[in-house]
Amino acid sequence: GCRKRGMVVLARTDPHAVHQDVFDAHPDWVATDPDGSPRRHWSMPEAWVTCALGPYNFEFMTEVHREIVRRYDVQGIFSNRWAGHGICYCEHCRRNFHDATGYDVPLRQDPEDPAWRAYSRWRHDRLLDVARLWDDVISGTRRGARYIPNSGGGALSSLDMKTLAGMVPILFADKQSRSGIQAPWSSGKNAKEFRAAFGRKPI
């Protein structure tokens, strides 16, 4: 198998969506629009998009990751779509953001708006907090195992890639170009951006 071939085995999670049974049990885990409507998945209408900044990731997915590395002989967990999609207006985001900054969650991405600038920083810090939490739980449960976040945005990422580089041993950039409008050389451009931030770490 993989071990005999000297391969590293990673599990994969995808925290960005849940099915109806999860929504029924925990509607507060789902991202919401400004009017409070829960957010349906754009390509799977039977699924719901989760909030990346609240208890679904910080509590539930933390325990999922702990269970995976406790029960299975894997050397890490890679998460796809872990950083959320768009601004979330769920009860947790509204309360936590207001408590942290004194602002309401902004309705639009306006760099001139101090609320948007505060939200961008708050979201960034929350995402790095959950990545650190998952890495701590995974490495603390199975020695040598690590958390690997998918970070395919390169220079266009909303995350500070230099900070992320200091947190992880390797980076994967999931570049699928499903729209058909990305230049063929964009993956190479991403690799150069990651190399600039990561130094000699593998990408």
Residue ranges and their predicted role:
Residues 11-72, 107-120, 132:
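Active-site-adjacent "subsite" loops/lids of carbohydrate-active enzymes
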Residues 27-32, 95, 164-167:
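Short, hinge-like loop/turn segments at secondary-structure boundaries
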Residues 20-21, 78, 85-89, 127-190:
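Substrate-binding cleft/loops of secretory-pathway carbohydrate-active enzymes
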Residues 2, 9, 61, 68, ...:
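Conserved, mostly hydrophobic/aromatic
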Residues 78-115:
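Active-site-proximal loop/short-helix segments
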Residues 1-7, 58-60, 126-133:
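Aromatic- and glycine-enriched glycan-recognition loops and surfaces
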Residues 190-203:
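Active-site clefts of carbohydrate-active enzymes
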Residues 6-13, 147, 203:
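Hydrophobic beta-strand scaffold residues
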